[in-house]
Every structure is written in structure tokens, then in C-alpha cells.
């Protein structure tokens, strides 16, 4: 993904979901992330990166397990969590930096 650095350097927070198609918890995160986007709207960008299709990007960002959520604010990593994360926790963290 050649424009990844451009995406995470946006002026608004960017939540990156590193996932895999075969991952059960990743599938459970999908509707949670949709709810986050519905609640926060244009205040956040959410992108999904398939680690099987982008292994070099996953390696570069030291993704060891999926799902891994990474939140960037103006290109700087401000939060990172592996595993299933609840909507209210994600919304709260994004609102703190917005």
C-alpha cells in the first residue's frame, strides 16, 4: 500500500485495523468499527489493512497478531491494541485526541 503514510498523516485521527479474513475476532471487530464510524462520522478515518495481502506493511508496523488496531494523530501513533476492543473504549480514545 504505497499511500499508507499519506493516509496516516491526515489532519484528523486515523484508526487502522490490521486484520485477516480467516480471523474470527477480526470479523467481530467489523461491526464495532462501523458503529464507531457512525458515531464519530467525519471526525475519524478508519481503514482496514489485510495482513495477508500486505505482509510487508504488517511487518513494517510490527503487527504480530490480528486484529491489531492502531490510532494515528497527524502521523504519530497515539494508541495501539491487539485483540477485540469495545466500541466505547475506541470512541473515548478518539474523542480525547480530537
Task: Name each model-derived stretch.
Residues 62-70:
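Structural micro-motif
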Residues 51-57:
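Structural microenvironment flanking redox-active thiols in thiol-disulfide oxidoreductases
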Residues 20, 51, 74:
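Active-site loop/turn elements of alpha/beta-hydrolase fold enzymes
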Residues 15-16, 46, 69:
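Hydrophobic beta-strand anchors of alpha/beta hydrolase catalytic cores
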Residues 1-13, 55:
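A short beta-strand-turn-helix
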Residues 11-12, 19-22, 65:
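Short pre-active-site segment immediately N-terminal to redox-active cysteine/selenocysteine motifs
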Residues 27-40:
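Typically the conserved alpha-helix immediately C-terminal to a functionally engaged Cys/Sec
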Residues 71-98:
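Non-catalytic, surface beta->alpha helical segment in thiol-disulfide oxidoreductase systems
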